[in-house]
Every structure is written in structure tokens, then in C-alpha cells.
């Protein structure tokens, strides 16, 4: 055996970690341990917490010289969170799954394999951990002795350190917000926590007062694919689960969402370090409201306000009774709601109507509370001295199972005046002999739907009853319908009088027993016909009742030659097998424009010419009347081209168009000349159906002045509150004030503009006595000279040259009783010199200047006199006589007229 080889001491790092693993180090929790005090122990000190952080930092700062076990994370700084923080398992990458135990130290013999119970015990995770057992350390390398030497008997201490990654929870950033308005932003991605973990799970709960909802607007949104933002409404109350409003894929910048409750949740998740800019959302509370209550069948509803406190009032049509609360109130709450369920309008099966004036009797709905078998009895009682007229509006009875009887009286024993089993439906109705009518309806499992609508009216015995025309109008010469009154009938578009032609006028006759001289006509939707009006309606036969089988109706629509027809399908609900065909021309031989079957939505069709033919075919078959089956078609003529009709410019105004041609979408803008105002809409739009959105406006001359207004410290009286042309406004001031300006203003008209007042609005100024002019100072003057100066006016003084001003240059009139100047007017005094010698020097200077000048003048005068008087010569040569003899030049011309002109005189001066 060779000599044992000297052993090198372990590195300081290994010794330090070995000491850490010793059991005598107590109270220092490692990374995966909870730093919780044992029962009965004191709270760890600050020093122990700092030491724990120091140890944890030492683990993170291990260098390459510390080997890692297989399966450990190659970068512990990424896999190991700070002390006390956790990471959610679903977001962990596979490389960081738990697979290591606590810090261990193993003593391995030269064989390189763990021997004895010490190795597995040390490599086994402690109880309570989820990490699987670690494999043994790797086999050591070749022997440390010389090559070919014997086996060494010494052992080498190998210290293996592993880093444990524990499954922890994500970072939470929850926030409860109760303000009415604000912003919600994504977490600060620059924080140390976000940089270390990169895992976020944030829930922002926004709640406001009950009765308010929350409106959000996405101002900024920049998320990566791994990030998710959810917007949920509701929650926070028992039985009220949150409802998803939108997620990241549904959101966009500028988008607005509303929560129907007073609570809203924003849930943001990021499985790794966020790379996007995040989000910014603005929120604000808004007042919630109740939904609009549904309109009951055979009734109506009127709403004052949909917000809490508003009411909804329900009404039923004539012949129907309200079932439920008549008035509902919108109650405040998390979700405002009406105080009760909306009522319904039901036709009663029988009853007594007292003091009847005008109303209806309607049969109950089939299959209702009364069941298929009906026995309904109504008693209609009018006031004393009146009788009743009963008009049959709609009657559809099963001949075998239904029966209707009407008695003139108020009991079942009164005489029968109508029996459906024996009599036809009376077109002019029934008139009672007394003040009551007894109506009885019997129905036993009818094969067809029951339809009954009777209109009753009470009238005086000395008058005729008021005539009634369904789907038409009645005009009369006497609204009281006394004897001699005439009633004229006309039908609504789509209907025709039946019987056709006269009489469409009936007369109330016989004063002793007033009655109409003829029956009332009826308005019915006919099967076919020729229509040449610019606009009208085409109805299915017998509309609004269902058409009967076996129909073959043809309608011809004709408009002006330069026009074409726009057909709008409002209602189309025909039975299976029935068909409505539209031909683009005159007659069924024209091109087929459309074929309509079964229920159809609203639509529009245009003909190419001025003619359109409609044919409706319903094959014969067993009767199957159904309510609401048929069609309603509206038509009107439009220009052949795709333009709206030309509109002239308004008188006293003009219009501008957005397009050269009046095509669909063209906008016309109207304006008026000065002095005129626009009556009507100033903007018209060419609509899809080639009609204008409104009637063209007009320019009307403005005949009123604008309100001149009140005055301060005064009042006014007007001749007309509208201020028309010619009206007057008179102004007066309060005591102590005086009027400055015109007291009366008159509104007068102008040809080229709006009416104008005759003068400006006056003012009321404090009443003060004026200041008198103080006078002009001697050797001076003043500006703005006048006799009187009002309070507040100023006066300025000036002096002539050589005088100086003594006193105030400007004085002001101070108001008072009387008003006074601020000071006395100034004086103008001669300017005085203080040195008399300067006056003498001034005189000498004047003498020195004037004396030579006088001498020059005297000398010049003497010279002039000498030459002119004594020598007889002109000093300047301006005299007409000359002292020189003239030089004569002979002319070559013999003409005596020019001889004088040829004599030239020359003067030479030296």
C-alpha cells in the first residue's frame, strides 16, 4: 500500500455550507422553510430575518465551482423567488418543476457509490414535501493515486448542494374601487416584484351606489398574446354571478362598455414578464334606468321617466279591461325594476255597463280563462231618455257552434231584435226601443276562431244616432244630428264604398221619430281594381280580416308617363300556396318583377315604367280564416331617374346643393336674405325613396325688432311685447337719475335689412347741477369752451407766449348740489427776468444789428438817386428808351409790310 496522499482542505465555501447544514444552527429558516415561530417562542428578531435574507442571497450567488445535481435549474436566480413569495404551478416551465431536496452533504467512499444508510437518508426529501427522492451523486472520476497504483484507502469528502424550487402562488394585485369616476391602469411593470416573478393575477373591483351602472372606455390597450384581460359585470351579491362583457380579443382602444349593475370586475393575468405597454381604462358611473315597459295587446302605455321614480301608466282600448296594476313605478336598486309585472288588456266575458255613452263589446280570446266553451252576457244601460244604437263592426261566427242574440231591454226575457241563427248581420245596425240592450254570446268548441266586435252609442230620442263608418270618414252638416242633418261618407285609401256609387249621403228625417233615410255604407278592401292616383294603398281582400280562399285579384297601378312607381311592402303574411306576383308593366303579360310567398319582411320595389300590375292568387280550399293574414302595400310615383324632384329656391333667399344632380344623399342648405327669416328646416336630404326629408322652407320678412332690453336705474313701457314694426318703447329713470338719450324708441322697417330701433337705448345717470364756465384767464385761453359742464367733465387752461401759468392746468367738475370745480381757474402772468444787465445786453445787440442795416439802406438809396436823377441813366436797363443808336439792317424783301419788322435793335451793355 502506498503512502497516503495528503488531503487538501475543502474550499471556504464548502465549509461554510457544511456549517449551515449542522443541526446546532437553530432559528435560521432556509428558502423552502416557513419562518414561523414555534408555539411559545418569541417572534424572530430583525437580526434573524436579515440573516435569513443573507443566507438566501448566498444561495443565489453560488458560482460555477459549485456543481449542480442533475435536474436542477441551470439558473437559480430565475427559478428561485425571494423569500416568502410563491409561484403558481400552472405558469412554471417544465425545467423548474420540483425535483430537488434541501441542502445536503454526503460522504462517499472511493467506490463512488453511496454506502450505508447515511447516503439515502440525506438525499431523501423531508416529510411533507412534494419533491421526489433525488438520485445519488454522480460516480467519481478516476482514482486520485498515480497511474497503475494501488487503491487508496483514504476517502474524499464530496459536498453536493442543490437548489429547491417550491410551487408557489402568483403575485396578487387586487384593488377595490368605490369612486364614481377614475382610471384603472395595468400594474407597474418596473417594480422589483414584477421584474423578478413576471407573474400577475390582478382583480380590480369597481362598485358604485345602487341605481347606478358603470361605463368604461378603453383608452389604451397593448397586451401580448399570453396576457388576458376580462371585463365582467355583476357579482358581489348572493345569486348574482358575474357576467362576461368582453375579453382581450373583443376589446379595442376607444371602445365603450356598460355594466347593467353597480359592480364591475376587471381581471388581468400575465403568465410571464409582460412585454406590452399594458392597459388604461377610464370608468364613470351613470344612472341606471328601467326598461321600457311592453305595450299591452289592445292597449297603450305612457311613461313619465325611465329612471328611478318614474311612472308608467297603462290604458286599454274600448271593449277591454285592464288586468293588473294601472300605474307602475321604477324602483331603485342594483338593477332598477318596475314595481310589479306589466298588466294586460283582456276582453271580459259579460258584464254590465252603466250610463253607457260610447264603447265596444269584444269577444274574449279563444282558449283563455273561459275555455273553449263560452257563455257571455252583457247588459248595456244608457241614461234616462236615451236609446242605444248597436253597430256590427266585425262578426265571424261558426254557424254550427256559435250563436249571438240581442234583446231590446235589460233582461233575458226582453224581446229579441237579432238572432244569428235566423237573421243576417244588419248593415245599418240595431236600435233599441228602450234605454237598455241585452247581448248574449254562446260558443261551444267552435271549429273556427271566434271574432266579435260590436260598437254601441247612446243618443237622444229626438235625434238620429251618430253614423259610423269603419275604415272611413263621416262629415255632417249638424254635429247634433237633428232632423234635416246630412252625413257624407268617404273611405280611407285602399278601401271602396260598398255598395259602390251613391248613396254616399244620408239624411236624418221624421222629427216625430228621427231616423236616417238610408243605411250607412261600408268601406271594404276590394279584390282588384284600377288605381291611377299619384299615391295609394293596395290591401288584400276584406282587410283587416283574413281573405277567403279562391281569390284571383288583379290591380293595375298607373302614374304619369314621365314617372315610375315605388312599391313598399309593409305587411305580407299569406297562407302557404298563395302568391302575390308583380308585373313590371301594364297587364300580366309584362315582365315579372317579383313573386312573393308566405311571410315576408318589409321591402321596396321600383318599376321601370309608369305601369305596374299586381296579381294575387289564393287557390280554393277549405276555409281557414286566420287573424292578420293578408297584405298591405303602399305605392307612389317617383321620377324615372335616380334623383329627387327639383325644388325651386325660396323667394327672398337661396339654396346650395352638395351635388350637382339631386341624387340620393344630396343635401340642400337654405338661407334667407337680410331682413328675412327661414320658416322650416334649413337642411333637406334626398332619401332612398327619392323623396325629400322635409317640406321646402320659406323666407318670411322679419317684421319685428329685437328686444332693446331694460336699463339700469330705470324702467320701460312697451306698446307691444312682440316689438312689431311701429311699436314704441318708452324709458323712464328712477328718482335722482336723469335720462341721457332718447326717451322713446320706435321700431321702423327697412327695405334691405331687419327692422331697427329709431335710436340707441338711453342711460340713466345721476342727476347733478352742471358747473358754470369759470371764465378765461387774462392772457390765456381754454379748450372745449362752453357755458355748462356736466359732472365729471374736465377743463384745461393754457397761457400765451411770454406768460406763465399760475395754478392748476386742469380742473374737473365734481358732482354735488351744486356741482363745483376742483379748484379755482389759474392765472397767466408775464414772464420776469432776474438780471437787468441782460436787458441792456439785449438792447445793445438789437442796436448792433439795426444800425448797419440802416446805413446799407441809406447808401443804396443815394446811389439809386444819383444814377437816375443826376446822370439820366437807368441803373438796371428796364426803361423803354435807350441811350444807344439803333443798328439798321436792310431787308432783301421789298414788301413794305415787313420793312418795320426787319429793323432790329441791339443793346450792348458794358
From Swiss-Prot:
According to the UniProt entry, which residue ranges have a biased composition of type Pro residues? Answer: 123-145
Which chain positions lie within coiled-coil regions? none
Note the SS bond partners: 173-202, 290-330, 316-345, 349-376, 464-508, 491-523, 527-553, 644-686, 672-699, 705-747, 733-764, 771-813, 799-828
The entry's localization annotation reads: Cell membrane; Endoplasmic reticulum membrane
Which positions fall inside the Sushi domain? 288-347, 462-525, 642-701, 703-766, 769-830
Keyword set includes Cell division: no
Domain CUB intervals: 173-286, 349-459, 527-638
Which BP terms in the Gene Ontology apply to this protein? synapse maturation
Q: Please list the residues annotated as glycosylated.
A: 176, 222, 247, 332, 355, 373, 473, 517, 641
Residues spanning the membrane: 845-865
Q: Which UniProt keywords apply?
A: Cell membrane, Disulfide bond, Endoplasmic reticulum, Glycoprotein, Membrane, Repeat, Signal, Sushi, Transmembrane, Transmembrane helix
User: Any idea what this protein is called?
Assistant: Seizure 6-like protein 2
The organism's taxonomy opens as: Eukaryota, Metazoa, Chordata, Craniata, Vertebrata
Gene behind the chain: SEZ6L2
